[in-house]
């Protein structure tokens, strides 16, 4: 995994505070599944059926580049306005599923297709300080959540990979209030609504007998 993050802050610019930054993250994995003669000994490869006990290989990679900027504007002591914008460029690639064919004594390879996504994520929030101890706020934000590698490319005995899994996209609306009594007592109340597209769910699939066949995100 490679993760590079950098940001710059411009503070007190004509009642504005601005933060801008960049984030780059690249992940990759390779999963090798082997048959063992002794499950307690991870080196006890069973080569009677599979070469070196190796019966399956799964691998893949993701890359995400994000640029963002956020501004905090305080026109006076009673109001604060927060605006922000983020752009993500996400790509999944090099997905591969390799299994050993015991009939023909060979490895068969399935190459998963690539997927690229570009998403703009704005946000806006307004906060009003009614008194020194009471403030109310309203906010909207859009979020972009790519699935982890384990959901896209990794197989287990029960769970199948889903290389066609798309990132989640959500819009969140929230209103709330914060009240303080002295330095030890506070009350926070909020109500929010979230609308999600391409929500990732853990789904169980059954065979014709009603038994669990496999699970998938």
Predicted regions and their residues:
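Short, functionally important structural connectors and interaction interfaces within domains
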Residues: 51, 112, 122, 126, ...
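Hydrophobic, lipid-facing positions within transmembrane beta-strands of outer-membrane proteins
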Residues: 2-6, 63-69, 120-124, 161, ...
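Gram-negative outer-membrane beta-barrel proteins
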Residues: 26-34, 89-97, 114-118, 144-152, ...
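Flexible, surface-exposed loop regions and adjacent strand-edge segments
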Residues: 1, 31-44, 97-107, 152-161, ...
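Membrane-embedded beta-barrel scaffold of Gram-negative outer-membrane proteins
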Residues: 129, 135-141, 145, 166-217
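Face-selective signature of the C-terminal outer-membrane beta-barrel domain
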Residues: 1-99, 129, 185-191
């Amino acid at each position: 995994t490679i993760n590079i993050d950098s940001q710059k802050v411009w503070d007190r610019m004509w009642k504005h505070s601005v933060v801008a930054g960049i984030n780059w993250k690249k992940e990759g994995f390779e999963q090798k599944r082997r048959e063992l003669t002794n499950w307690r000994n991870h080196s006890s490869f069973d080569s009677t059926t599979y070469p070196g006990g190796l019966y399956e290989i799964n691998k893949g990679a993701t890359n995400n580049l994000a640029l963002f900027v956020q501004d905090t504007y305080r026109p006076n002591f009673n109001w604060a306005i927060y605006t922000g914008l983020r752009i993500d460029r996400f790509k999944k690639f090099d997905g591969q599923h390799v299994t050993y064919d015991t009939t023909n004594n060979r490895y068969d390879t399935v190459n998963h297709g690539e997927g690229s996504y570009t998403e703009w994520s704005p946000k806006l929030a307004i906060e009003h300080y009614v008194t020194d101890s009471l403030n109310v706020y309203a906010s909207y934000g859009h979020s972009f959540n790519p699935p982890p590698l384990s959901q896209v490319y990794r197989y287990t005995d029960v769970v199948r990979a889903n290389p066609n899994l798309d990132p989640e996209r959500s819009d969140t609306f929230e209103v709330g209030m914060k009240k303080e009594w002295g330095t030890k007592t506070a009350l926070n109340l909020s109500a929010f609504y979230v609308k999600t597209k391409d929500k990732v769910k853990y789904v169980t699939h059954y065979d014709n007998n009603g038994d669990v066949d496999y699970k998938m995100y």
